[in-house]
Regions:
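Extracytosolic ligand-binding ectodomains
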Residues: 2-18, 27-438
Length: 438
């Protein structure tokens, strides 16, 4: 199967999905030259379904994300099946809850691979779950594509079966943002972050980047994931801090922001936060007035006017999100918009790699073709399949690089004020998965 290219007949069957879509490039012979006119109707997918295992945080601390990850995954699969499937085959999503728990995460990988007999596994967010489950995926020799943001993939600490092609990692994010923060907000910075791997990535990589730019980390304030009251941590923030850099996750984030406002009041330092602290939360909620004028990182702007492209509008419509970033059916149900796009883009990366590698069924030969094809990718072009923007893919790291947004809270809404370049987040590779055996 290795070396096989998608045939013209197969490409024509799935061409409807390719119109306006991003395409995986840098592999050699690619599909775009075979795209017919947009009016062409794709053939209905047929044959044995391609089964994609979805490790989802339906319960536990990641449930808010999990609900929107699942909604996005279902929307992407629906679009695929309306436009020819994958290589002409229907796509079936096989979802399994891991409870946002590392131990259960390992069990889910085993269940999906050994019992459900899926072709691929994808979708894991929380880094502690990824770090626990990824080694088992490697042992079972099944491709495992995560939507996590952690540096654990690009670090080389996992294995050749693990990829993160649909979302950027923390190291790239903070490398791109650090110059803007130091230049515009101040050099003396206190970091407040969750006490687990994701938070440590922020601590290590933003701290190092700020210091290279002449900044100084005044204090580090790690907070346990299960914490429900935060007031006792705020006295650890030095009074002469210029900027409080905060990135919190989980169900206590609203309490965290409110208590921070009660503690500092009008005398607060400048704030730079990550939308992780506010995913699923209405910026206009009572108690969040404290955030007015502060700055927030977004991977994909929640408000439709933040990045108004036709691809973004298409994606927003397909996942059922309104112009303010909430569900079209329930305006109180706020999305995880800066993360869930990674689910959509990862599923379409799977589609692209399957069709260009000639993958047909689980097994060493076809998995090798799939993995080596994806490792040879260089770009995922902006389009309906990649609405957040083009991605530079580094095959040796199994990691995508993209652009970041800085938004300011203005009149209880998020207003984009800055967008980085892809190269701003690039860093020297420290690993090379392509040298590992399969």
């Amino acid at each position: 199967m290795s070396g096989r290219r998608i045939t013209r007949r197969e490409a024509m069957k799935t061409a409807g999905a390719l119109v306006g879509a991003g395409v995986l490039t840098g592999i050699g012979s690619t599909v775009p030259s075979l795209i017919p006119k947009a009016s062409a109707q794709p053939a209905k997918p047929s044959g044995k379904a391609l089964r994609v295992g979805f490790q989802v945080h339906r319960t536990g601390i990641g449930a808010i994300y999990g609900a929107w990850y699942e909604r996005t995954a279902n929307a992407a699969v629906k679009l695929m099946n309306e436009t020819g499937g994958i290589a002409g085959r229907p796509v079936e999503l096989v979802a399994e809850d891991d409870g946002t728990d590392p131990k259960r995460g390992v069990e889910v990988v085993e269940k999906l691979a050994q019992q459900a007999k899926v072709d691929f596994i994808f979708g894991t967010l929380f880094s502690n779950v990824v770090i626990a489950a990824a080694p088992r995926a490697g042992e079972l020799k099944i491709p495992y594509l995560v939507v996590s943001e952690g540096y654990h993939v690009a670090s080389g600490k996992l294995n050749r079966y693990i990829f993160q092609p649909g979302i950027t990692d923390v190291r790239a994010q903070v490398s791109a943002l650090a110059p803007w923060i130091v230049r515009n907000l101040g050099k003396r910075i206190t970091m407040v972050y969750p006490d687990y791997a994701f938070g440590y990535d922020h601590r290590d990589f933003f701290g190092a980047a700020a210091k290279r730019l002449g900044g100084n980390i005044a204090a580090l304030v790690p907070i346990p994931l299960t914490e429900t009251s935060f007031t006792k941590y705020f006295p650890r923030i030095p009074r002469n801090t210029d900027v409080v850099y905060h990135v919190m996750v989980g169900p206590g984030v609203l309490t965290f922001v409110r208590e921070m406002g009660e503690h500092f009041g009008a005398r607060r330092q400048k704030l730079f936060g990550f939308i992780d602290s506010l995913e699923g939360v209405d910026i206009g909620s009572s108690g969040l007035e404290f955030l007015e004028g502060s700055y927030i990182w977004e991977a994909f702007p929640r408000y439709a006017d933040g990045y108004p492209t036709r691809y973004e509008a298409f994606y927003r419509s397909r996942v059922g999100v309104n112009a303010s970033g909430a569900s079209q059916q329930d305006g109180k149900n706020v999305s995880a918009y800066s993360h869930m796009f990674g689910v959509w883009e990862t599923l379409f990366v799977i589609k692209e790699a399957v069709e260009q590698s000639g993958y047909e069924s689980p097994g060493p030969k076809d998995y090798r073709a799939f993995i080596e094809t994806l490792e040879r990718a260089e770009w995922f072009n902006e389009g309906n399949w990649h609405p957040q923007g083009s991605k530079r893919f580094v095959g040796r790291l199994h990691q995508a690089f993209g652009r970041q947004f800085v938004s300011q809270v203005q009149n209880k809404k998020l207003k984009v004020v800055f967008r980085t370049k892809i190269e701003d987040g690039m860093y020297p590779p420290e690993a090379d998965y392509t040298k590992q055996p399969l």
